[in-house]
Amino acid sequence: MSTQQTAVRAIIFDLGNVLLPFDHGKMTQQLAAVLQADPSELATFLFGPDEWFLKLENGDFPLDEAHRRLCERFADCSLDAFANAGGDIFVYDEPMHRLTRTLKELGLRLVLLSNTSALHIDYVRRTYNTLEPFDELTLSYQVQASKPDSAIYRHAIGQAGCEATECLFIDDRADNIAGAEAVGLRSHLFRGIGELLPWLRSQGVAV
């Protein structure tokens, strides 16, 4: 006897390397240029044992304070130069944007769930139309929790306005998929739109 699959009412998407490919190496090089810093020294500062960049994404300090701290550590630059150098790390993905628009037209609720900072989400907002189809944004620096912490998934489910079993979750990291499945989300490890579309259809989404 087959069991009936719960109908999908909402889809929760990751941002980086799902909706928009990105490159932290590009960010490091560009920030190094405006801060007059050695790229390897800056990379260690951002991503080394102190986890400075993870703290920024987790909302431990705001963007203007991040700018001040980096200028104190390296060299002065304007906030605009800092924001552009740090934010310009994405590549626009038109097929994924078309997909999210289609899903929205199907009547599904769309939620973005991203470990991100104001540095990156503000750049995406002012540069691309990627976020237009989304009903809600669950952003780590605002929630002050990051994937795979269960708290941020539960926040996104709340924004979806339905049960976890009625949501799908899409992310490019296996640890984030495991965290999502632990709270009851049907999840897909993203490896490109070519694998995503058949999975969505297998979940009853007519794309």
What are these regions (language model features)?
Residues S2-R9, F13, S117-V207:
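Asp-based, Mg2+/Mn2+-dependent phosphohydrolase catalytic module
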Residues Q4-R98, E105, S117:
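N-terminal helical cap/lid subdomain that shapes the substrate entry/recognition surface
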Residues D14-N17, G59, L103, L112, ...:
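Generic structural signal for small/hydrophobic residues in well-ordered secondary structure
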Residues K26-Q30, E51, E65, R69, ...:
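Alpha-helical elements of Rossmann-like donor-binding domains used by nucleotide-donor carbohydrate transfer enzymes
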Residues R109-V111, R186:
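Proline-centered loop/turn at the N-terminus of a beta-strand
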